A protein has these predicted regions:
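Active-site neighborhood of HAD-like aspartate-dependent phosphohydrolases
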Residues: 54-102
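Non-catalytic pre-domain segments flanking phosphatase-related domains
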Residues: 25, 36-66
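Short hydrophobic alpha-helical segments enriched in small aliphatic residues
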Residues: 7, 13, 22, 26, ...
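Short acidic-hydrophobic, aromatic-tinged amphipathic segments that line or gate anion-handling sites
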Residues: 262-266
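Helix-loop "lid/cap" segments that line or gate small-molecule binding pockets
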Residues: 86-87, 107-121, 178, 211-212
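Metal-dependent phosphoesterase signature
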Residues: 113-152
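Substrate-recognition "cap/lid" segment bordering the active-site pocket of phosphatases
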Residues: 142-143, 171-223, 229-238, 252-253
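Substrate-recognition element of Asp-dependent hydrolases with the DxDx(T/V) motif
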Residues: 83, 150-179, 187
């Protein structure tokens, strides 16, 4: 492991030998099941570290604040369909899936400003934006689903007593609707775009601060998880450690260019950070 020659030993995981510790130290799974007493193949040096693992428990996070689109849910098809419905009704050219992928992340108004020719300066913009919202309110779940491994991750976090919340630049109605459909057993709060109430959208810290208040935790006790440059900036502005996911709407190089330092390829890897 790590290029070093360590003697390998096969041990049974103790009750207090957390799975997060196993993942954190890159321990290789020996038997593929979820029994906490399963055997793991680890180095002797790493096994000796298990006595230190108990001390890590004291520094664990108490909460996770999630972005929604591209992080918990694949929503791109429904966003594209709503965009193209509105554009078509207004006699405007439709957009491809890749174009819509590039447009999302800053809220649906900016999505439509990018999709509509001449943006907000187009005389038909407000009408087209209203058509988008009308369509999306009804069709926000036609082709939407959680990413593979998300529901299992949320269940594990719940078992561990980790509190969770969603903050999204998506329309608040849609955020709460999707939360109720998929995550009602897990989320303490689900907060969407609420600028009319004086809560600025991401990357301003307002939404995260509201979530932390509802969770009853401080910024040091929570981590932020998202898939975009907006999420990286949001975490920084809110004083939270950021974990960037690679399965969302932005690729790895883009995330790194925008300051991502903690990258995960699978939902289960988030357990390394709590």
């Amino acid at each position: 492991m790590g290029g070093m020659a360590h003697a390998k030993v096969c041990i049974h995981v103790e009750e207090d030998f957390s799975r997060a510790f196993v993942l954190k130290h890159k321990v290789k799974l020996f038997k593929n099941n979820d029994d906490r007493n399963e055997a793991y193949m680890i180095s002797k040096t790493e096994f000796e570290k298990t006595h230190i693992a108990k001390g890590e428990e004291e520094n664990r996070k108490k909460a996770v604040v999630f972005d929604l689109d591209g992080t918990l849910l694949y929503t791109l098809e429904d966003l594209k369909n709503a965009t193209n419905y509105a554009l078509k009704q207004s006699g405007m050219p439709e957009r491809t899936l890749d174009e819509v992928r590039r447009f999302v992340g800053n809220g649906v108004r900016l999505l439509m400003e990018r999709a509509v020719p001449q943006g907000a300066d187009n005389p038909k913009f407000e009408e087209t934006f209203a058509l988008f919202k009308e369509y999306y309110d009804v069709h926000c779940n036609d082709n939407t689903s959680p990413y593979d491994g998300i529901m299992e991750l949320l269940e594990e976090l719940k078992v561990r007593g980790i509190k969770m919340a969603i903050v999204s630049n998506k329309i608040d109605f849609a955020v709460k609707s999707l939360d109720k459909l998929y995550f009602k057993d897990y989320m303490t709060a689900a907060i969407g775009e609420m600028e009319e109430e004086g809560i600025r959208k991401k990357p301003a810290p307002d939404m995260v601060q509201k979530a932390l208040k509802e969770l009853g935790v401080t910024q040091d006790e929570a981590i932020y998880v998202g898939d975009s440059d907006v999420d990286i900036a949001t975490a920084k502005n809110s004083g939270l450690e950021c974990v960037s996911v690679t399965w969302g709407f932005r690729d790895v190089e883009f995330l790194k260019e925008h300051g991502a330092t903690n990258l995960i390829d699978e939902p289960v890897e988030l357990l390394n950070y709590v």
